[in-house]
Amino acid sequence: AFPAAMRELQARGLIEPIKEAIAAGRPYLGICLGLQLLFERSEEGEGAEGLGILAGTVKRFSFEHSVFRIPHSALKIPHMGWNQVSSDKRQATSDKRCPLLEGIPEGSFVYFVHSYYGDPTDRSVVALEAEYGVRFAAMVWKNNLFATQFHPEKSQSVGLQLLNNFVNL
C-alpha cells in the first residue's frame, strides 16, 4: 500500500501541497497509512520513499527478535483488533500533552489493522505507544501534525473523542 499510495500522491500532484500545508501550520491528521507516509522510507517495497516529514522508517512486524516472551504463533500479521495504548513516558511527564488526547483516559483501547509501523528517529514525537511483539508508535504528534496508526473511526468513544478534539483545534 505504501509504494502505491506514494505513486498516487505523486501522480495527482499532492506531495508538495501536503508538505506546504503542514509547514504553514495547518492541522494535519494522518490515519494508518496516513501516519506511515509521513516517514522517510518504508520496508514495504524496495526503496519505497515517503514524504520525509518525519525522520525514520516504516518497518514490518517481525517477531524473530521480539523482546517480549510471546510465542510467535500467538501474534498474527496483520495486527488486527483492539489493543491498549499508553502515553509515551516523555509525553506523560511533560507539561505539554497532545491536545488530541484531552478527555481520553490513559490505557484506553483502540482498533488497529496494520502489518507495518512507523519507527521515528526522534522518539519525542511519539504521543502514544502500543505493544504487539514490539513497542511501536501508535500516535505521533509534532506541532500541528498528528497521526495515528490505529483507526479512530473504528475505536468507538475514544476515537470519536480524538476526532472531536482534532475538529475543534
Model segments located where?
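Amide-donor transfer/coupling interface in amidating biosynthetic enzymes
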Residues: 23, 57-169
